[in-house]
């Protein structure tokens, strides 16, 4: 169905995701996972309800682009069966991811409701994705971002993650196997949840920054395997010219651990210390701490 919105309605759709590339590309979803409506456009004026069928970007001034927006959604993906497929190269995605849930709520300055597994595996394996959208939600739900960008091997940076209210497995494996990722976001949450950061950056071999971790009360599996295989993350037990920055879990204060909370957190990393760190113990790193 084609939607040529009247002027007043059209003006409201200023909140959307933009996919763009200097090269031709297309987007499809084999099994749609959203529970409301999604629309796509090639010019931000003429919107078509989308059922997941393959849509091709349109070229203007040397740039190919597609735009997506939504209404009445509480989830967009929900696991690997519902992931989006991007065919092309050097594809950038910009805008507020929440515009896919409900653009009117975003336009009003609010956060739409997130269901469990809302964006889980959405872009998993999208090796052509170079830039990801903003993720402004401050209150998360179970597995909402799990595996969202897993295997996105062209990503070098990621957006800020401002959430302070976490949920079970919310960031689990979110950026795993993003082999070009160099910079981690800060992680401001002080209250953790079960498996919240488990394997979040595993196998990110280009990662050279580590987030400080302020939470003093750990939860079961919260940090396990978090940096496994990050060969450019380097920790040591003793300070040296190379390992000159203090790194501690928690960042300050006295922490309380939990079942397997720190298991193999630094397994197969590149420093002289690897494996499972101890809580309330100062280590030293050569990396930048964010």
Spans of model-derived segments:
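Enriched but not universal
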Residues: 1-28, 287-290
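Short beta-strand/loop motifs in extracellular/secreted proteins, especially
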Residues: 25, 34-38
